[in-house]
């Protein structure tokens, strides 16, 4: 293995086009040499969500220049890069095709190995880049396409303990915002309105709370919000703020129950891991300050470290893709063949039951 490998990462699974260069030394320490992300928010905001065809075209238009910029910011050329890592799933198939085909072309032309990376694995391993975290640990992934509680045992070794049985949490935020006439993306808009709201005005349901299994459900909560809004329409600004605050409180209480049970299970299964156990949160919804505070308090109560990587590394980015490639390289995983195909569905836990449905931001995995 190259003693100080350097990887170019490419991410195009949804509505961010990203490229990054990351290197790792023999002790596992990393350096982010560049991190370039182009959001497609303006392209999709008029539609209230991500339009797959528009996303794919935007990736085509932007990716080559972003890769050049990532190399320039890192002050390296392709000759200085040891491998290419590109997201190959899960996600929107059009975007995945753009990124993976670009990665293949670069790997072929430059004579570099290619790592086809699972987007979820990128999220799962980010805390090892930012915090030097050791295995095992728990990860809560909360985004527009996924809500999963995952046991991370090692690189390529994952067990899904819980997942949404309907809407992802980010999807619930977006749909609630749209219902209330708030702008896209919905998460930040709902959080802003909630700051001025009365969280006790509406007693929204907390689906699956109290159940032993660790799954999530948010469609019933979304329906309750719609019915409450219809009952008091037309809505004043204060009504909207109160609904948002009550919605967030219901989610916080749901996560407190679901994740609390997960932390207890972790302690039962790993009673003596030699260090303080950790809960990692990732995904765009991880930016929500109320949810972070809930998880921090839960971890404090249960004797866990709470790790939330910087927001730029919680949302979709190419740093995590490059890092996942480096992690695989470090344990001797062979590169992928150049005929590897993108996968719209690609669960981290190959033994997990297949999920039903197709989320707002792509196939559920």
From Swiss-Prot:
GO biological process: tRNA threonylcarbamoyladenosine modification
Catalyses which reaction(s): L-threonylcarbamoyladenylate + adenosine(37) in tRNA = N(6)-L-threonylcarbamoyladenosine(37) in tRNA + AMP + H(+)
Binding site for Fe cation: 119, 123, 316
GO MF annotations, alphabetized: iron ion binding; N(6)-L-threonylcarbamoyladenine synthase activity
GO cellular component: cytoplasm
Domain of life assignment: Bacteria
Binding site for substrate: 141-145, 174, 187, 288
Enzyme class: transferase
Co-factor remark: Binds 1 Fe(2+) ion per subunit.
EC number: 2.3.1.234
The protein's required cofactors: Fe(2+)
One Pfam family in the UniProt entry: TsaD
SUPFAM superfamilies: Actin-like ATPase domain
Keywords noted in UniProt: Acyltransferase, Cytoplasm, Iron, Metal-binding, Transferase, tRNA processing
Subcellular location per the Swiss-Prot or TrEMBL entry: Cytoplasm
PANTHER family: TRNA N6-ADENOSINE THREONYLCARBAMOYLTRANSFERASE, TRNA N6-ADENOSINE THREONYLCARBAMOYLTRANSFERASE, MITOCHONDRIAL
Recorded family membership: Belongs to the KAE1 / TsaD family.
Annotated function: Required for the formation of a threonylcarbamoyl group on adenosine at position 37 (t(6)A37) in tRNAs that read codons beginning with adenine. Is involved in the transfer of the threonylcarbamoyl moiety of threonylcarbamoyl-AMP (TC-AMP) to the N6 group of A37, together with TsaE and TsaB. TsaD likely plays a direct catalytic role in this reaction.
NCBIfam families in the cross-refs: gcp_kae1, T6A_TsaD_YgjD
Protein's name in the database: tRNA N6-adenosine threonylcarbamoyltransferase
Highest classification ranks of the organism: Bacteria, Pseudomonadati, Pseudomonadota, Alphaproteobacteria, Hyphomicrobiales
Gene name of the encoded protein: tsaD
């Amino acid at each position: 293995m190259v003693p100080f490998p350097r990887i170019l990462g490419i991410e195009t699974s949804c509505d961010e086009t990203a490229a990054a260069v990351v290197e790792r030394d023999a002790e596992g320490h990393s350096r982010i040499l560049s991190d370039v992300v182009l959001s497609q928010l303006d392209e999709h905001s008029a539609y209230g969500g991500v339009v797959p065809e528009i996303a794919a075209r935007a990736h085509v238009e932007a990716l080559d220049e972003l890769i050049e910029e990532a190399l320039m910011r890192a002050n390296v050329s392709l000759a200085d890069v040891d491998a290419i890592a590109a997201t190959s799933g899960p996600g929107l198939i059009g975007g995945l095709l753009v990124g993976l085909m670009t990665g293949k072309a670069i790997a072929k032309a430059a004579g570099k190995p290619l790592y086809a990376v699972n987007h979820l694995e990128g999220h799962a391993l980010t805390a090892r880049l930012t915090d030097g975290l050791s295995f095992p640990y728990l990860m809560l992934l909360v985004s527009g396409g996924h809500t999963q509680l995952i046991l991370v045992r090692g690189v390529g070794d994952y067990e899904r303990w819980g997942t949404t049985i309907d809407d992802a949490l980010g999807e619930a935020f977006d749909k609630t915002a749209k219902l209330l006439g708030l702008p896209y993306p919905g998460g930040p808009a709902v959080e802003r309105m909630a700051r001025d709201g009365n969280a006790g005005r509406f007693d929204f349901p907390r689906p699956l709370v109290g159940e032993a299994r660790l799954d999530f459900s948010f469609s019933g909560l979304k329906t309750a919000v719609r019915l409450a809004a219809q009952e008091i329409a037309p809505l004043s600004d204060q009504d909207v703020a109160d609904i948002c605050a009550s919605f967030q409180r219901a989610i916080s209480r749901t996560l407190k129950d679901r994740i609390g049970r997960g932390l207890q299970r972790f302690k039962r299964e790993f009673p003596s891991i030699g260090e303080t156990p950790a809960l990692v949160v990732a995904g765009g919804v991880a930016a929500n300050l109320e949810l972070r505070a809930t998880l921090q308090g839960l971890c404090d109560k249960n004797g866990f470290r709470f790790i939330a990587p910087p927001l730029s590394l919680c949302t979709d980015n190419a740093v995590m893709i490059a890092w996942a490639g480096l992690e695989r390289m470090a344990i001797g995983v062979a590169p992928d063949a150049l005929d590897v195909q993108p996968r719209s569905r690609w669960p981290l836990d190959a033994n997990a039951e297949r999920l039903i449905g197709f989320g707002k931001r792509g196939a559920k995995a």
